[in-house]
C-alpha cells in the first residue's frame, strides 16, 4: 500500500489581495457614511446646548432681577452660578469649540442663541 502525502492547501497571494481589497472597500464605505453621522451629531449637540443656554438665561430674566441686556452681558457668570447646569462655560461652546452667539432679537423682547457653524451647515 502506497502512502500518499496530503498536500496542505495554502492561501495564494491573489486570494489574499482580493480579501484585503474587499476589506478596504467596505471600510472606506463605512468611514464615508460615518462622517455624515458625526456631522449630524455635532449639529444636534450644538442645538441642545443652545436650547439649554436659552432656558437658563430666560429663567434668570424671569426672576426679575436683570434686564435682557444685563442677562446677555453677564451670560458667563449666570451660567456658572446656575444650579441648572454643571459647567456653564462649556455650554457656551458649540461642538466644534467655537463660541455660541447670544443676542437680543429684532424686537428686543427675547434672546436668540445660535452657532455660526450650525447656521452655515443648514444654509449650505
Curated annotation (Swiss-Prot):
GO terms for cellular component: cell outer membrane. The keyword Hydrolase does not apply. It is found in: Cell outer membrane. Keywords: Cell outer membrane, Membrane, Signal. InterPro entries: N_methyl_site, Pilin-like. It comes from the Bacteria. It is a peripheral membrane protein. It holds the Pfam family N_methyl. Residues 1-31 form the signal peptide. This is Putative outer membrane protein CT_569.
